[in-house]
Amino acid sequence: ESAPAPEVSGDAVFSAIQNGXLKNLGNAFFW
């Protein structure tokens, strides 16, 4: 609980791009 999972980093970022408005930012980063 105290220590964050290593997968959370990538998963959270991807989730934020998919659910957030960071789609433009994600596009520039992933594409």
Curated annotation (Swiss-Prot):
The keyword Secreted applies. Coiled coil: none annotated. Keywords: Antimicrobial, Fungicide, Secreted. GO terms for cellular component: extracellular region. This is Antifungal protein 1. The keyword Secreted applies. It is found in: Secreted. Antifungal activity against C.albicans ATCC 76615. GO terms for biological process: defense response to fungus; killing of cells of another organism. The lineage of its organism: Eukaryota, Metazoa, Ecdysozoa, Arthropoda, Hexapoda.
